[in-house]
């Protein structure tokens, strides 16, 4: 499987941002920040994301907005 961004993984399972955020018990803004690389999810949320989006951790790419 090709690597997926968080947004691509979400879209692949047919979820909009509002629904995914609700399922993950986070705000739409937080999910948007994760998808845009502004911030990153904590490890316990990554497990929830993988389950909700039906992907393995190794299949995901986490964007970084301001790389060093």
Predicted regions and their residues:
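A short, Lys/Arg-rich alpha-helix, primarily the initiator
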Residues: 1-12
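Helix-turn-helix DNA-binding elements, focusing on the entry/boundary residues of the two helices
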Residues: 6, 17, 28, 43-46
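Residues in the recognition helix of alpha-helical DNA-binding motifs
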Residues: 9, 23, 34, 63
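The alpha-helix within a helix-turn-helix
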Residues: 10, 21, 50
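Short alpha-helical DNA-recognition segment
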Residues: 14-33
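DNA major-groove recognition helix of helix-turn-helix/homeodomain DNA-binding modules
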Residues: 25, 44-59
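Short, charged recognition helix plus adjacent turn
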Residues: 33, 40, 51, 61-68
